[in-house]
Amino acid sequence: RLKELIDYGTDFDRRADGSFDLVKEGGHSDKRILHYKDSTGNEIERALVAKVKSFASVDFFTHYFAVDLITQHHLGEKVTKDTPNKKCFGAYVLNLKTQKVETFLGKTTMLATGGIGQVYQSTTNPKIATGDGIAMAYRAKGFVQGMEFIQFHPTALYNPGKKPSFLISEAVRGHGGILKNQDGSTFMEKYDARLSLAPRDIVARAIDSEMKRQGTVHVFLDTRHIPKEEILQHFPMIYAHCLKELGIDMSEEMIPVVPAQHYLCGGIIVDEFSRTNIQHLYAAGECSHTGLHGANRLASNSLLEAIVYAHRAFEKSVEEFGTQGMPSNIPDWNDEGTRNPEELVLVTEMAKELESIMSNYVGIVRTDRRLKRAYDRLELIYIEHEELYKQSKITVPLCELRNMINVAYLIIKHARAQRENKGLHYNLDLIS
C-alpha cells in the first residue's frame, strides 16, 4: 500500500542518497515512519484526491451532509441490535444548496467520517469531526466498541480561543524536543524512562499532573538546541505557525504546549475487511474500530491502518457487489409537520455545554463521580435536543449536535463500564 501511495505521487521526504528519511515518534522503538516534512497527512490526501479526480467515472458530491443510514427500519421493520441480517441500502443526505434531504441508494456504503474531537473544548481535529459516521452506525444498530479510549495529544500549541488547536507534531520530540516546566526544569524523568518520547497517554497525564501541581495553564517544549536549519527543513509549517500566531521563533524561544483531544481508538466494530455487523456497510479510518491500536494508538499508525483497511474494503465490496438487492419501496425523507428552527442559539449553547461536560468530566483523568455527573447532565441535553430535532427541519448544526450527543453518550457509557485502567482510560478510583 505504501508503494501504491508513492506511485500515486506522494512525496515522502528522502535523504541526500535517495533513501527515505525514516523518523522515530513517541512509543516507537526505532526510526520506521515515512513522512513529508511536518504535514504527512495533508500530502497523502493531496496525492489521493488528485488520483481519484483522474478517473472520469467517479462522481463527486460536495456540499452534502449525511443524515442517517437507510436500513430495514425505514421499510417499517423493527430493527434492534440483535436483529439478524441487518442491511444498509444507502443514506439520507442533506443537499446544502437546496436544503432538501435526498435519498442516496447504494449497493455498498462506506463510512469514512473521521473522529469525534468537537465533543471536547480543545481538540486538534477539524470542525467537521463531530462523530457523524459513528453516530449514524449506532442509530442503525451497528456495533460500537472502545469509545472510552480517547487519545489526547500531549503537545498542542497553547493559544486560548483557537479551535481547532494547532498540533506540534510528535516528530518534534522525536527530533530532540524536550518538555519543560515554566521554570525551565525537565519533568518527564519522574514519569517514564523514555522521557519526552514516552507513549502519548503517559506524556499527556504527566503534563496534566505538572500543570495541576504548579497551577499553570501550559508547559513548554524546548527546541532551542536544535539547529535552525534543521527546524526549517523538517518543521516548516510548525515554525511558520508559531511565528505568525504567537510571534515565537522556536529556534530561540520555547513553545507553550498543552494536551488536546487528538484521536479516538474506538469506533464502529469492523472485521479484517472493514465490514460492520450491518450487511453492505463498511467503515474505515478513525470512525472504525479494527482493534489494531488496542487501548492506545502509536503515533502515525492510523495512516497505515487507513490505507490498508480501505483497500481491503474496496476488494471485498467489489467481490460482494452483486449480492445486494435493492428494495423498491424505500421512502423519501419525510419532514412533514416540521418547521425551520427559529432558536439556533439553543443548538449553539447546547453544544458548548456538551463540550464543557466532556472536557471537565471525561478528559485525561477521570473518576466515577465525574463520569456519573457527565451522564446525568448529558441526559438533560439529550431530552432538550430530541424535542427540538423532532419539530425542526434538518440543518447541519442540528444534525451535528445530535451526533455529538450520541457519541458523548457512548464515550461516557463505555468509560463507566471499563473497570480497569489501561491505555488511554485512566480512572483515579481504579488505582489499587
Name the predicted role of every residue range:
Residues 111-112, 283:
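Redox-cofactor binding/interface segments in oxidoreductases and associated redox assembly factors
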Residues 4, 10-31, 180-196, 207-210, ...:
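Glycine- and aromatic-enriched mobile tails/lids
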Residues 113-123:
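Flavin (primarily FAD) binding-site architecture
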Residues 2-18, 59, 143-146, 217, ...:
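A short alpha-helix-loop-beta-strand transition element characteristic
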Residues 7-100, 105, 112, 156-159:
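Conserved redox-cofactor binding core of oxidoreductases
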Residues 68-98, 103, 248-290:
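FAD-site-proximal beta/loop scaffold in flavoenzymes
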Residues 125-138, 144:
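Thiamine diphosphate
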Residues 136, 142-249, 253, 307, ...:
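An anion/pyrophosphate-binding glycine-rich loop and adjacent beta-alpha core
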